[in-house]
Structure formats: C-alpha cells, structure tokens
C-alpha cells in the first residue's frame, strides 16, 4: 500500500455555553468510525489558520472569521488508511496535526451545522459528555491535553 504525507489543520470549536463540535467522516474517509474535529489538508501557499478556517467552512458550514482563534501548542502525528476520492485507491496517510482552539460567542443551538465535504455527521456536545464518545487517537490525545476528557 502506498503512503502519502499530509499536514492537517483542525479546530476544537467551543460555543459560549460550553459545547464542543465533533463529527464523523463519511465512509472511506480518515478514521471513519471514530469521532473527530473538523479539519483537513493544508493546501500549498495556505497558512495553517487559513486552512483551518477553510476546512471548517467546507465541512460544517461555519464561518469562524469573527471567532476567537488560538493556536494549540500540541503538535501530533498519526497514521491511518484512506480511500482517495479521485482514484478510489486505498492509501496509508502519515499526518501531522496543527490545531486551533476556536471560541464562537454564541450558544451551540444558535450555531447551525451544514454538512458538506468529508463530514457525514456532526453535533454540538456538552463538554461534560465528551468522555462518552470514542475518538481518533489524535483527537483523544488532544482532548486529554486540553482537560476535556
């Protein structure tokens, strides 16, 4: 199986009433059976923050231009399998994750989710219920480092 490298920008989205946005990728996607945060590949010439903003808009339809955005110091790596959309080829993906903490000054119920791109499901989860879900290894580690689970 062929291996590809990808730098990934993602975000932990917080509402002002202590909910976090998590989702699951569509079938064949990265970590398809586990909960993840919105994010995706950083395009050439794009900053990590620009990529995170674009991916959030593409995956869940939320514009975070006016939100508080802070880089998370923890940089992680991970490897998983993925089916390439254009060719159907199954590949191994070596990823480096660069994440941001994004705080939106609205309650979760007032932040609509519009699923597009890679996300097949997404929901706002109260922080105290995050420990009930099964996450990708990188998201689990990230949530633990932030004291969320």
Predicted region positions:
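A conserved beta-turn-beta hairpin within the catalytic core of GNAT-like acetyltransferases
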Residues: 29-33
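Short glycine-centered helix-capping/turn motifs at secondary-structure transition points
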Residues: 146-147
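Unchanged
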Residues: 42-138
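Conserved N-terminal beta-strand and adjoining loop/helix that marks the start
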Residues: 1-20, 38, 98-101
């Amino acid at each position: 199986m062929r291996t590809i490298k990808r730098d990934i920008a993602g975000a932990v989205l917080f509402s002002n009433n202590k909910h976090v946005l998590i989702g699951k990728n569509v079938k064949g996607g990265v970590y398809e059976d586990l909960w993840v945060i919105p994010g995706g590949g950083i395009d050439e010439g794009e900053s990590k923050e620009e990529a995170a903003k674009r991916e959030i808009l593409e995956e869940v339809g939320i514009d975070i231009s006016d939100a508080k955005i802070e880089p998370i110091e923890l940089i992680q790596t991970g490897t998983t399998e993925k089916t390439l959309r254009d060719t159907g080829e199954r590949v191994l993906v070596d990823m480096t994750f660069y994440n941001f903490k994004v705080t939106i000054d609205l309650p979760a119920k007032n932040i609509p989710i519009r699923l597009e791109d890679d996300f097949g499901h997404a929901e706002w989860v109260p922080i105290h219920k995050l420990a009930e879900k099964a996450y990708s290894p990188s998201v689990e580690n990230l949530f633990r480092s932030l004291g969320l689970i």
